[in-house]
């Protein structure tokens, strides 16, 4: 049977107090509904039906050109009515998995367990036991078998005492789902078409109903307001931090780290507090990352060090390279083995060769820098002429004095020395010494101006 996923994402989310549709509010810089979509893809979904309503334009803009079937729910008449909008894209032989766009922490392993629990031609529902089940639909059993789900507002005193609750997530055979949805009624306390009513129909039809449970109740928590959104964010971060520690990272304080993408770590990685990871970050063995650093879409090789408050974006650090504190590597920057940049050095589309150093206060853009090069404080590669970018090439073992400007395009030959305060506008040959600053003058008897008293 093909797996067909229906994601309900039509709600406005009034309690969010926002113009943004509820499901677009982010967890770890990714919308809640995108988390759900990604999880659906990860379990091998053949098709995803996204049932939408409020904020259609914003939803379509945010989710882009993904492989989704957009199914409009013009009126919000209940969960059963929402799922019914997807019927045109459901085949009789499909296994239909129903998910929710505001339940972002559901794990692939939980959904796989749910699908495995579904009997042939039967139903599987995801349930959880809560000490305080108030507000949730209760799982009604007779002699241990599920016979129905009753919503909070429709439950009697005996049913309200039940601790096993419905998460709303279920796996249903396509043909039966179509039949049951067609038989739904809105004759209930809320005047809605409850999806949960199909469970009683399944029981009445003699269909076997199994249950599965998540590893943690937080997986099935939704977010209806910003407080709950923040709680889900913290839960997500705790889960991701745990993965890093299991993989070999030592987190100084696991509660003070933000992971907003896919992070891969080697062994004995040290991560100080308030570090942010975004996008795809790959970190080797024995890497040290200082407090307040931000790593975005970057690769860090073994034994490298990122000192506090440095920003590494779209860049690479080679073996035993170091950056910071307060350094910035922008897209296309690369530090080769044993290379170092210090505080307030910025690089973009530039390579700093093996063992080369730029200790402080420099801008290196559109530059190819060889091995064993020293970049003095205040050095700037003047790479932009107002219209186009140009390349600076600094070959091996060059010494660049402090406060030097290199006006690109320009090449500095091997072993050359550039005197402090020079402005280099022409190529420099190998082993040459170049000084372009004006001759120093000594004016004796000169008096400094004084303020005129008024």
Curated annotation (Swiss-Prot):
Record's keyword terms, sorted: Acyltransferase, Cell shape, Cell wall biogenesis/degradation, Cytoplasm, Magnesium, Metal-binding, Multifunctional enzyme, Nucleotidyltransferase, Peptidoglycan synthesis, Repeat, Transferase
CDD domains cross-referenced by the UniProt entry: GT2_GlmU_N_bac, LbH_GlmU_C
UniProt EC number: 2.7.7.23, 2.3.1.157
Ranges where the record places region N-acetyltransferase: 248-454
UniProt region (Linker), positions on chain: 227-247
Source superkingdom: Bacteria
Subunit organization: Homotrimer.
Name this protein carries in UniProt: Bifunctional protein GlmU
Organism field: Shewanella sp. (strain ANA-3)
Recorded name of the encoding gene: glmU
């Amino acid at each position: 049977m093909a797996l067909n996923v229906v994601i309900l994402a039509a709600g406005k989310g009034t309690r969010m107090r926002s113009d943004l549709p509820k499901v677009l509010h982010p967890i770890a810089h990714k919308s809640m509904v995108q988390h759900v979509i990604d999880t659906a893809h990860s379990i091998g979904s053949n098709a995803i039906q996204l049932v939408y309503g409020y904020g259609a334009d914003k939803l379509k803009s945010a989710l882009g050109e993904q492989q989704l079937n957009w199914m409009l729910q013009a009126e919000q008449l209940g969960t059963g009515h929402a799922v019914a909008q997807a019927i045109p894209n459901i085949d009789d032989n499909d296994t239909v998995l129903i998910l929710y766009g505001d339940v972002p922490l559901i794990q692939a392993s939980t959904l796989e367990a749910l699908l495995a629990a579904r009997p042939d031609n039967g139903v599987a529902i995801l349930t959880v036991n809560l000490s305080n089940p108030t507000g949730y639909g209760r799982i009604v059993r007779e002699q241990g078998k599920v016979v129905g789900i009753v919503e909070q507002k429709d439950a009697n005193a005996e049913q309200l005492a039940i601790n096993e609750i419905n998460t709303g997530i279920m796996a249903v055979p396509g043909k039966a789902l179509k039949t049951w949805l067609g038989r739904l009624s809105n004759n209930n306390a809320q005047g809605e078409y409850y999806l949960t009513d199909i469970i009683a129909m399944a029981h009445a039809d003699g269909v076997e109903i199994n249950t599965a449970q998540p590893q943690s109740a937080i997986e099935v928590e939704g977010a209806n307001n910003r407080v709950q959104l923040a709680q889900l964010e913290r839960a997500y971060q705790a889960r991701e931090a745990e993965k890093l520690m299991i993989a070999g990272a030592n987190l100084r304080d696991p509660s003070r780290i933000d992971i907003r993408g896919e992070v891969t770590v080697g062994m004995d990685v040290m991560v100080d507090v308030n570090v942010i990871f975004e996008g795809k970050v790959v970190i080797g063995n024995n890497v040290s990352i200082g407090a307040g650093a931000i790593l975005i879409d970057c690769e860090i090789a073994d034994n490298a060090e990122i000192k506090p408050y440095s920003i590494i974006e779209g860049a690479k650090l080679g073996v035993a390279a170091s950056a910071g504190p307060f350094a910035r590597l922008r897209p296309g920057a690369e530090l080769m083995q044993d290379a170092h940049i210090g505080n307030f050095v910025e690089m973009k589309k530039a390579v700093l060769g093996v063992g080369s150093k730029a200790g402080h206060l420099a801008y290196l853009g559109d530059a190819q820098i060889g091995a064993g090069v020293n970049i003095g404080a205040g050095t700037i590669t003047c790479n932009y002429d107002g219209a186009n970018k140009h390349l600076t090439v600094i070959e091996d073992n060059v010494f660049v004095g402090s406060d030097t400007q290199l006006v690109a395009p320009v090449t500095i030959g091997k072993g050359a020395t550039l005197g402090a305060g020079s402005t280099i506008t022409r190529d420099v040959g190998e082993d040459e010494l170049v000084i372009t600053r004006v001759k120093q003058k000594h004016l004796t008897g000169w008096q400094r101006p004084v303020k005129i008293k008024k």
